[in-house]
Amino acid sequence: MANLPGDSIQIAREYMDSLLVESRIIGAVRPTSRFEFLGESFDTPIMTAALSHIDLVGMAEGAVKAGAAVSIGMGDNDTLGEVINTGAKVMKIIKPYENHDEIYSRIKFAEENGAIAVGMDVEHSIHAGDPEPDNIHGLQMKLPSMDELREIIGSTKLPFFIKGALSVQDAERCAELGCRGIILSHHNGLMRYAVPPVRLLPKIREAVGDKLILIADGGMESGFDAFKALAIGADAVTVGRPLMAALKENGADGVRDKIKEMTDQLLAMMYRTSSADIRHIDPSVIWEK
């Protein structure tokens, strides 16, 4: 999809690069990147994205070394168990399977084996190029109705996140349904001409206040990007492609080093803007070109 008209990855990148940061260095104190999430404490608000079809165990091992939370995508229950056994604090994102037994069995396994949250990437229910339901590895997807989502969310004691909520309307519906949070994502450009997740952050934060945890996904290539997202409404960010490249090049240590590099970049921006911690970044430091 790259270089095609309406490439959402390119649109998101261009928007991110249009955001500028105002320096406020006089009187600044050395900041901390500590991140409190679902009763757990982490060294960074930079999380792994809900990736699939890679070495998820290696990714988790690297995240643990960097003090980061982990989200994972497709993979069987055995793989989820192996990831949790690394010591990672894991959010399991589940596909919108047409057969709801597939959903409930994965939720149950996540509950019983120590995941800290579960969720669903609802945006993966519709095929990228036509209005037909998606099919992944022979398993049919289907967009759940509001009532079905309410039942799914209510079936678990774990905090539930919707991945792919990318509008004020969807965010408000997630709050109504009892979600703990949303992951703002265009799913690697699945939808053409998508509004960049970061561009929607301020409006969604204004609409839902503190009712939802907001996690920004898509196009997070540096700690500078993470800073911008945190400044305008995100509680955390997830990173995909840069960590996939680091994992391929140097395994778990590569993931650790990349997360630490991005966290250092984040801390540098926080220091230069008098942001003592991630909860106290003044959104007015962000300017648009």
Predicted features and spans:
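Active-site cofactor/substrate anionic-group-binding motifs, chiefly glycine-
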Residues: E36-D76
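Active-site metal-binding loops of divalent metal-dependent hydrolases
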Residues: L51, G218-M220
